[in-house]
Amino acid sequence: MVFRVEVGLKAGSNSDLKDAVGLSWKRRIKTDLGISLDDVKVLKVYLFDCRNVTQQNIVGFATEVLADPITEVFETREILADNYDFDWIVEVGYLPGVTDNEGKTALWGLKTFLGSVEPDDMVFSGRKFLLRGKLDEKDVKKIASDLLANGVIQRYSILSAKEWREGKRIGNEVPRVKSHTEPKVEKINLDLSDEELMQLSRSRVLALNGDEMKAIRNHFKELNREATDCEIEVIAQTWSEHCKHKIFAADIDYKDTVNNSEETIHSLYKSYIKRTTQELRDEKPWIKSVFDDNAGIIQIDDDTLFAMKVETHNSPSALDPYGGALTGIVGVNRDIIGCGMASKPVLNTDVFCFASPYFKGELPPKLLHPGRIFRGVHRGVKDGGNESGIPVVNGSIYFDNRYIGKPLVFCGTGGLMPVTVNGRSSWKKEAKSGDLVIMCG
């Protein structure tokens, strides 16, 4: 059975509590979308999909854990909105399969409260927005789709006050992943014309060009067998721009119109980054490790090494600003821990480039407003850095409307490690047959 718990601030003549979260959303709706509202109230929603949990258990848990008795009230039915004045309801929750950290924390709390839960019990979190103002359904859909919910990871439902008074409700449908498919390996015939190969790349969203598709075709022709769908996907992923950095590795024909000269650059990365660093490394013995590990390592005194890693998370942050930036910063935290024989993260850094957060123009389809990206990215790096115990010691933010299509989200982590560990150079590591592997995270 699914139980619903809704939590909101106390309302009524005896309460002068301000909904700071609601006021923040009201301001963002005005700033980002140009839509004025009289008020916004935000309720927390929890759906408990638990087998052996009773209504009494849920009431006790909500009383003791979910709601603050001084400032909040809760209901275990979908009636809490009756406490507030509103014209529209928008309820937002995660799509099936999307990580719901608040829901996981609520389940952990329930397990602690009750002593145990079933292995397949789940809790799903969401938010119910109560909007008051002169809005039509088109306005509400715009607010929901462009600001309150991110369609990549979230779902939303809309009710008018009229529908609410008539008894219509959102309901307790939980976003469990339901799959009844059997694993199947598909054979792919690559004996195709060049145009058919490109059609295959487009239809399977491989994002590979003609030369790459022909190389795959020729490879399996030499093997004298068909490729499987899994093999094709693995090759496409490995050859993606994200993994392979094909632009950095490509031959670039460069024309200098000032000096009237032309040259072919064989890999921007190898010519201007790796080669330059290698030349410095040959002259500077304090450069201990570059291009060989999860991070670069230098020696800063007789006893200490400093490791540094930075990377971009641009496209993920454009799709899901908070999640994209969060995984960017914790990813480089991980790389520092994993470089050499382990380094301790001591600092984070970042550089952000966005379009103006006050952008008023028409956005292309599927693009988030730059103000929304700005706020989400900032929160993601903050949560993954400062709030995990690693201080963000410096950074910069640059605004230019040419970043409207894709922001630059540059995240970095620095760490310290001793020069030697048990008599061995800490920046060197090797894996041998029979070694144990530890996975963490």
Stretches found by the model and what they are:
Residues 1-441:
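Core nucleic-acid recognition elements
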